[in-house]
């Protein structure tokens, strides 16, 4: 497989799996302090439930004040935690723009006409074959006869068109997965395996 195609696939994998960095950011921004406060409140609340306000008024009142303090602390720490996670995700989004989106877009423009594979000439109407070979620009220039077909018995499929088709397929699969995940998580997991095999097959081609 051509080096440029492998590079495009690498960018594609990075683009489609970048959302995992958000999960990683959530894990790295440890909510340990928040969890500790929540556990403390749960334990104190259980203790408070077992006390009688009449028989243990002083302790019951003290626990109530402590619960109020814990509620405020939990709200403050949760807010700080969520802000920290969002700030990390924003930095990751900027990083993606620099290391994935911009280079990937530039590469697609630079190598968009690179032949990926060939189809027998005559399989599709001339207009479609011209688009497969020259990309979307052919649609605008075809009436002017400014784009010519390559000689031979086959029509080369350009990298830009191949990538467009692959992204459309992946987008459709992602939509189906999201729909299944909402309806049946187990079915979504099985479909995800099919998705992985499809991506592997595309890489092999």
UniProtKB/Swiss-Prot annotation:
GO terms for cellular component: endoplasmic reticulum membrane; GET complex; Golgi membrane. Residues 32-96 form a coiled coil. It is a multi-pass membrane protein. Residues 25-96, 174-205 are cytoplasmic. Keywords: Coiled coil, Endoplasmic reticulum, ER-Golgi transport, Golgi apparatus, Membrane, Transmembrane, Transmembrane helix, Transport. The chain crosses the membrane at residues 4-24, 97-117, 157-173. The keyword Endoplasmic reticulum applies. GO terms for biological process: tail-anchored membrane protein insertion into ER membrane; vesicle-mediated transport. Residues 1-3, 118-156 are lumenal. Its main location: endoplasmic reticulum. InterPro entries: Get1 (IPR028945), Get1_fungi (IPR027538), Helix_hairpin_bin_sf (IPR029012). Disulfide bonds: none annotated. It is found in: Endoplasmic reticulum membrane; Golgi apparatus membrane. The keyword ATP-binding does not apply. HAMAP family: Get1 (MF_03113). Component of the Golgi to ER traffic (GET) complex, which is composed of GET1, GET2 and GET3. Within the complex, GET1 and GET2 form a heterotetramer which is stabilized by phosphatidylinositol binding and which binds to the GET3 homodimer. This is Golgi to ER traffic protein 1. It comes from Eremothecium gossypii (strain ATCC 10895 / CBS 109.51 / FGSC 9923 / NRRL Y-1056) (Yeast). The lineage of its organism: Eukaryota, Fungi, Dikarya, Ascomycota, Saccharomycotina.
